[in-house]
Structure formats: C-alpha cells, structure tokens
Design a protein with these regions (language model features):
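Short C-terminal tail/terminal secondary-structure segment
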Residues: 2-4, 158, 238, 249-263
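Canonical Rossmann dinucleotide-binding motif of NAD(H)/NADP(H)-dependent dehydrogenases/reductases
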Residues: 4-38
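Conserved glycine-rich Rossmann-like NAD(P)H-binding loop of the short-chain dehydrogenase/reductase
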Residues: 34-49
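Catalytic Tyr-X3-Lys loop
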Residues: 89, 97, 111-130, 145, ...
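Short, small/polar-rich loop/turn modules that mediate ligand/substrate recognition or access, typified
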Residues: 92, 185, 190, 248-250
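Substrate-binding pocket helix/loop in short-chain dehydrogenase/reductase
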Residues: 102-119, 218
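Active-site helix of classical SDR
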Residues: 133, 169, 177
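Alpha-helical segment proximal to the catalytic Tyr-Lys
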Residues: 138, 182-183, 246
Length: 263
C-alpha cells in the first residue's frame, strides 16, 4: 500500500522551524519524501542547523531567515524559496511568540501597557500568518493545489488570563484561516488549524522539575497525563499537509492531550 502521508511531489515551507515544534514538522516533511523543505526562522543559525540535519539525512532543505511580521521580509523569503524549488505546495504558519523575548512591558497587564508591547504578540502570531498566507496563495491558486496549516493555541480558543493579547492574536489567526478556507476551496486549497496546549520544551521541563507541585497541577489539566511532544503536533500537521487530507478544510484540530474536548 502506498504511503498516504507521503510528501513526494510537494515542497513545504515551515515558519519558526529552527527549534521545537517547527523543527519536528520540517523533519517530518523530509522523512516523508518532500521534494524540498524551506526551513524558516528569525535566527538564521537555528534554521541552518535544521536544514543541515535534513540534508545530512538525504533530504533536500534550505534555510531562509525572515521576520514573518515584516511583509517585505516575507515576500523576499518566498521569492527565494520559489527560485530554489519552483513552488510552495504546503505552508505551515508555525512561528509564534508567547513572550520568550518580549518587549520590556509585555508581562505587565495589557491595560497598563500600550501598542508597542502589544505588537510583540500581534506581529508574529497574527500579522505573520496573514503575511505568509498572502505570499503563498497566488502560486497555489495558479496551480490549483495547496495546503495551509496554522498553529494556534488553547489560549486562542478558550482564553488565558494574563495572555490577552497573545490569545487574541491566535484567535484572530483562526478566524482568518476559516475565511481563507471558505474562499480558497474553489481553487483546491485546504486551510486548517492545529490547536496545541502546553509543550514539553526543554525550558518548560526544567521549570516543572524545579517545582513538582506546580507541575502536578498543570498535568492534572490534561486527560493524558503528560505535556505535548513536538512529534505529536508534527504528526497532525503532516496529515493536513499531505494528500490524505484532500477533503478536509476549515477545521481546528486540538492536539492537547485532552485539555479540551468536544465529544
């Protein structure tokens, strides 16, 4: 039986792919035979390390630096990607910022700050999705084929006190994707979201190890008593980027260990 999750004949571009979830998505694409993988990150060295890893394993990848919140930067990235591979068949809007390197005021209550602090979150989590999707769509429309997957978060679906601007940006990205799905279906372009919960990144794991009681409280919120792994998310993104999901569009798929469910 053929591999229904094969990426052969497809070129994927993954934003924020220099580490964690984005890195694993890029590796998944390559492992499933993608003709090419464009590894984007704001930090070129991180993107290059992932591209080198893919190429060393026999894949075909390039690293491209771009700030997804900057429209011109994104346009230049896509131009270079198309120059290299001729097309982008699958776009994964993975780049996000929940405050890893925020504006100095970004951790204060949002009503005590202002637009400069808010831009930290809106620029990447909302504007970045629009910029990259706008850059990808013309080619997809011309070829009558394309997959767009945007990573959002439980905060964007259910809210999270103290993360109002981030959550609003993620919710906005989801609404944008729903409209893209409705408008682009006639062109055989699929648009979906993957909703993720807390991920077991090295930084989070370190924090939980230092505070076992807090770790216990966090894990009790998840039906499956662990944090997410990058491969959990990458598996779903691979499905939504492959031919296996050709009749699936306009959906949000929670990959969050049962933090929320709608059965």
């Amino acid at each position: 039986m053929d591999n229904i999750l094969s990426m052969q004949g497809r070129v994927g571009l993954v934003t924020g792919a220099g580490q964690n979830v984005g890195r694993q998505i890029a590796l998944h694409f390559a492992a499933h035979g993608a003709d090419g993988v464009v590894v984007n990150d704001f930090v070129l060295e991180r993107a290059q390390a992932v591209a080198d890893e893919i190429n060393a394993a026999g894949g075909n990848a390039i690293a491209l630096q771009a700030d997804v919140s900057d429209h011109d930067s994104v346009k230049a990235m896509f131009a270079r990607a198309v120059q290299k591979y001729g097309r982008i068949d699958a776009l994964v809007n993975n780049a996000g910022n929940a405050g890893a390197t925020p504006h100095e005021d970004a951790r204060k209550p949002f009503y005590e700050t202002g637009p400069e602090a808010w831009k930290t979150f809106i620029g990447v989590n909302f504007d970045g999705v629009i910029n990259c999707t706008a850059a990808a769509l013309p080619g997809m429309i011309e070829r009558k084929r394309g997959k767009i997957v945007t990573i959002i978060s439980d905060a964007g679906r259910w809210g999270d006190p103290g993360m109002e601007i981030y959550a609003g940006a993620k919710a906005g990205a989801a609404g944008f994707m729903r409209s893209v799905a409705r408008g682009m279906g006639r062109h055989n372009i699929n648009a979906n979201c993957v909703v993720i919960g807390a991920m077991g990144t090295p930084m989070i794991e370190e924090r939980m190890a230092k505070d076992p009681e807090r770790a216990k409280r966090i894990l009790e919120k998840y039906i499956i008593r662990r944090l997410g792994k990058p491969s959990d998310v990458a598996n779903m993104v691979l499905f939504l980027s492959s031919g296996a999901s050709d009749y699936v569009t306009g959906q949000m798929y929670p990959v969050n260990g049962g933090f929320t469910f709608t059965l």
